[in-house]
């Protein structure tokens, strides 16, 4: 008996999932605050309704990461082979152009209108941290960057770096991929902090695109 479990998402499906993720992202950034800042509804043991809704909204990251793993695998399956240099060039050129564009727009605003100087943000080793932050790797290196919400770039950069090697395990070694993702999640290793919660979502996206035979 032969079977294949595969998730076939069309463009409208992925757009719908992205839309849901964007709504969750909005929920997270609007309502994830420290309890006690306003008259929130107390649920139990120091948990408050609005804050819990904000925490739930961070599910958006897992959805985005799942779709990234899914989309990269669909594209790789079409070409049947990953050209390492070409893959990295295509992915990172687009990623960094977007990231640096955000820097060019928002960092001057922070400096001019909110007194968010590099010294006040990085505290020490300012130039080293600035370079790391411009490279999008601040969260991976143990600190939040100029804007804490940009931590996601560390996550996606590392996942892009890992993808060609994870792809080689796809299919025959799905179990190893899943155990790797779960192992990193459970271990909570500090030097893998940028991906330890999301590698499993990325891997599941890859497996969903490739199918389980």
Language-model-detected regions and their locations in the chain:
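Alpha-helical transmembrane segments and their membrane-interface exit regions
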Residues: 201-211
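Catalytic-loop motifs flanking and including active-site residues across diverse enzymes
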Residues: 65, 200-201
